[in-house]
Each structure stands twice: as C-alpha cells, then as structure tokens.
Amino acid sequence: MTDKIELTVLGCGSSFGVPLSHNIWGNCDSTNPKNYRTRPSIYLKKGDKSILIDTSPDLRHQLITNKIDTVDAVIFTHAHADHTHGINDLRSIALINKKKIPVFADKNSLNTIKNSFSYLFTKNDKHGYEPILQKNIIDNEILDLNGFKI
C-alpha cells in the first residue's frame, strides 16, 4: 500500500451551501465557478482504501462529480444536518460493493444519527431494507483505520 494520501474536498460551503437556494451569493463573486460550494464532506484515499468524512446533503452530487464509487468507512465529526443528511446515499455504495460500511463518531453523535436513520443500522421488516451501516463509537483515541491514523 502506498503512503500517499489523496484528499478531496467534496464540499466546503456553509450549512446552506453557496449560493443560497434563492440564488443569493452574499460576498461571493457569482461569476467565479470556484464560489459554487456544496456542503461539507471530505474524501481520503490511500492505495485502494478510502474514508469519507461527513455525508453532506449534497453527497450524491459530490460522489458523481468526483467519480467516487467506493467508501470503506465514514467518520462523522458531529450530528448536524449539514454533515449527516446525505447518509442515505451510502446505500447504493454498500449495495453495489456488497458490504456494510463501518461508521465512526462519538457516542452522542452516533446515537443521534442512528435514531434519525435507524433503517440504515438495523433490519426494517416493514420495508425490507437490510442494514448497510455498522456503528463504531470513538472517544478521543487515535483511530487506526484502513491504514489511516486519525
């Protein structure tokens, strides 16, 4: 495995994104394409392993735009909507790759995420969804994950 880590900033906009949904740009120059910013997510790749940090509501667009079809693990920085509400877009990746995706967060954040998106973590007999995420609580320790030390 190579030591080179590729970091792709998938989104770096505010919780609203830039521009706002009413095409409000604030102080950003609307003629500069770099000022179109989706909400926060980061993708790390090292060899054939990858980690996604946060699942913004813009995740589907971010994955397609950056030709990302594999996510080996997800780390959530916190449970706010702008960092979690793209979580459902992990379903297609898990189904195509035929494996559950481990997700990591502190206990409170992970409980909030699991309560909001329980169908991704536990079998839902009503709708027939198989769980596609595996929860892992982290607590201020160094995480050695797929060759990444975080």
What are these regions (language model features)?
Residues M1-I150:
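Binuclear metal-dependent hydrolase catalytic cores
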